[in-house]
């Protein structure tokens, strides 16, 4: 049977959900093919969304019309702002989720979205015509034809689950791997490598001894992810903290020879920032203990996820390890930890739209591109879906810059640098992180969302009013001169503020940590009518004024530099500071400008600086 649609999405994980929902929302006829409809939106690993860098991604996905934020706000068990005591640029919203509620909410959203149909089957191969994808075939002999195909297969491509010496061809424990599609992608000439990730054991909640464990609460004023969420007052559950100990470590050391990670059984490279417990014991042998979080998987607290204990050790060793830990002496393991090894395609095979360079109309998103994490997958799925629709409409692609969004940083890192280990987002990856805060996501991306038809007009108008109020009042504060007069000193004293000794502007005064919203309204009467969102932005802009201005200057400098043309006869060979790889790629692609050079995978900002210098020297000579 042959079925037709505009866009096919393969895989119903976090990338596939966003890709299919956004494409349908933008008016395309979308069909989602997934192995099991019941597992759409399943959180395969930890029961949490957000965190440092990841919270930024989730909020960006939300502003651009995505679903992850609203699903999380409707399924969370605990909400916190991480790094709350630090600056706003490095704070991250994180939520523990009820895995069942999240999955069911996501599935129902997908099944009830207009323009979006779903079928339960396995995609086996792509159909190509003249190096352009036109459809797929499935394991039940269905043929689906479409103008665009988005592959979001997660860990299922030639997936192998490892628990001790035991191996099985699974994409997730108990679910079949996608071997035919994996072979098809290799045959098409994509650069395929292997990666490894893992998950932690789960234990029965009624078998844990919580007495004596440190209780970890959610925030009193819980933060939420979606700007559409109203009247947020969720029921919050506690997590609990326990630790490994020298006995735990000795059990693991005694069984290193049985660990797939060390025996040579696993070839794929694992995540640097989420190592297994056996890897931690091996690499950090001097540490006497490692922190573990016991996280409820559902509102019923029937199972707890042991965060920090990712492992692929044999079953009997996992039992001993868990029973050596305080609070878990009599714990009943409901699900064992395991490692999973899988195929991924080097993301340097992609353009910034996430379309493959090799095959027109084929987009890749999520772990197939070498990333790890639900949020990274969701961000890619969203961007692939948007760009597939824009291509259908013959409209310009939607590419976010590194100075606009963490999504821009994520995709630029992937397609220009590639990866040889699971890529995870951190705030440290962004050069302009002071400009890319969670709190200003709406202001950064609202205009894009509205232009794409993904934000309501009335809300956008209010947002623009707020944006205008921020700029006008910052200008007014900069021009507002304060001198240490009796009146000014008296007013500062009444607000329990230190006096000023010299002439200052309003921005300098608001840069003080102690100058909160209440004091802002009291001291500067023109700020009194402003809403909390506007006041928060004014406060942050004042506090980091010098650094924010510097970052804007750097962006302007970079934008100016990227406009520089490269002479047709420019010789790249022999320029000090350019690696052999950079020279080879520049000679091969012959970019016409530094911007085109920046789009070539492997060309770094340092390479661009060197090129800029030598182009300038050549002009002057």
Swiss-Prot record:
Gene3D superfamilies, per the entry: FAD/NAD(P)-binding domain, GidA associated domain, C-terminal subdomain, tRNA uridine 5-carboxymethylaminomethyl modification enzyme MnmG/GidA
Molecular-function GO terms, alphabetical: flavin adenine dinucleotide binding
Cofactor(s) the record lists: FAD
Binding positions for NAD(+) per the UniProt entry: 270-284
Example of a GO cellular component annotation carried by this entry: cytosol
Swiss-Prot/TrEMBL keywords: Cytoplasm, FAD, Flavoprotein, NAD, tRNA processing
Function: NAD-binding protein involved in the addition of a carboxymethylaminomethyl (cmnm) group at the wobble position (U34) of certain tRNAs, forming tRNA-cmnm(5)s(2)U34.
Protein name: tRNA uridine 5-carboxymethylaminomethyl modification enzyme MnmG
Source organism: Helicobacter pylori (strain HPAG1)
Gene for this chain: mnmG
